[in-house]
A protein has these predicted regions:
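Nucleotide-activated donor-dependent transferases that construct or modify glycoconjugates
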Residues: 6-20
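A structural signal for short, well-ordered beta-strand segments and their strand-loop junctions
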Residues: 15, 42-47, 167-169, 204-206, ...
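A short, glycine/small-residue-rich beta-strand->loop->alpha-helix junction that serves as a flexible
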Residues: 18-27, 175-181
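A donor-sugar binding/catalytic signature common to diverse glycosyltransferases
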Residues: 20-21, 26, 30, 242-282
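Short, solvent-exposed loop/turn segments at secondary-structure junctions
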Residues: 21-22, 48-53, 132-133, 171-175, ...
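Histidine-anchored nucleotide/phosphate-binding helix
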Residues: 26-37, 187-194
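Secretory-pathway luminal glycosyltransferase catalytic domains
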Residues: 55-198
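Catalytic donor nucleotide-activated moiety binding site of glycosyltransferases and closely related
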Residues: 169-173, 192, 198-236
């Protein structure tokens, strides 16, 4: 057992690059908070705006204690030179860090049952490049307090939705696992069962596919509460609206969600509510 007041831990520089979309990055931030609290040190988090998520952290959440958010601006996809320069700068900055861990490296530690702190305890510099939850549990999501504008929009929607409701998250887009394992028919079947239990139940629907919303509204009817939104993740408005959806899901009685979706998982943990994942048995 090692001691937290050991200089190698107190003086350690830890940089975490948060990858992926909103749900993924929230998991990474929660892990960074847990690590920061355990080591009693500041963790630097790289927040790179890109096609997966283009929105300032501070337009989504309030400032965090002991987490230093370092943002990089969005670069348009056609600007190959700028993208190459960014990759080169990242490589040059972190290639000589004592320990460098990506998703595969973190999975290897986990499968080998090696504790992350034990692995890094003698390092002076650590670079973690991931879209995954890598340390502690996800309870540290509670430290992610929505920015004022996000909170106000969510408050209005909660008032308009009125009363108890069930959250429904249908993930489509580029998530092939969700599309393959969480068919629309299974969602419809489950929602109809809920209606039989309670004819007055409402469903708050969050989805990145307007076609899915159209189908559910046609089949399930007025019980569906749905706010059409900007779906492009490369637009800040799209990410802000996604966070509002996540907050509404987290305030539901429970979530009926998609398989292999970090958004579904994070919404459930964020609200500490039950999650029922739609997964076909075929």
């Amino acid at each position: 057992m090692y001691l937290l007041h050991c200089n190698s831990l107190l003086d350690m520089k830890i940089v975490v690059k948060a990858n992926g979309g909103l749900g993924n990055r929230m998991r990474v931030i929660a892990s960074s908070i847990a690590l920061s609290q355990r080591l009693k040190t500041t963790v630097e988090v790289l927040w790179i705006n890109n096609v997966a998520l283009n929105c300032s952290f501070f337009d989504l959440f309030q400032k965090l204690d002991d987490i230093e958010i370092v943002e990089s601006v969005y670069i348009k996809s056609w600007n190959k030179i700028a993208h190459r320069q960014r990759r080169k700068k990242l490589w040059n900055t972190y290639q000589n860090f004592d320990i460098q861990l990506n998703d595969e490296g973190l999975k290897s530690l986990s499968s080998s049952q090696i504790d992350l702190l034990e692995h890094i305890k003698n390092a002076e510099t650590v670079f973690i490049d991931t879209c995954e939850h890598f340390y502690g549990d996800l309870s540290c999501l509670s430290y992610l307090i929505p920015a004022d504008g996000i909170a106000e929009t969510a408050k209005i929607r909660l008032s308009e939705t009125g009363g108890a409701y069930i959250g429904v998250h249908i993930r489509r887009g580029d998530n092939t696992m969700s599309k393959a394992n969480s068919p629309t028919a299974l969602f419809i079947q489950t929602l109809k069962k809920e209606q039989k239990r309670n004819a007055d139940i409402k469903f708050y629907l969050a989805t990145d596919d307007r076609g899915e919303a159209k189908i559910l509204k046609k089949v399930i009817g007025k019980s569906i509460v749905y706010y059409p939104s900007e779906l492009a993740r490369k637009r800040p408005e799209g990410i802000q609206q996604a966070l509002v959806d996540l907050i509404l899901l987290s305030n539901a009685k429970k979530i009926i969600g998609s398989y292999w979706s970090s958004f579904t998982e994070v919404a459930s943990v964020y609200g500490n509510i039950p999650l029922e994942v739609m997964k076909s048995e075929e």
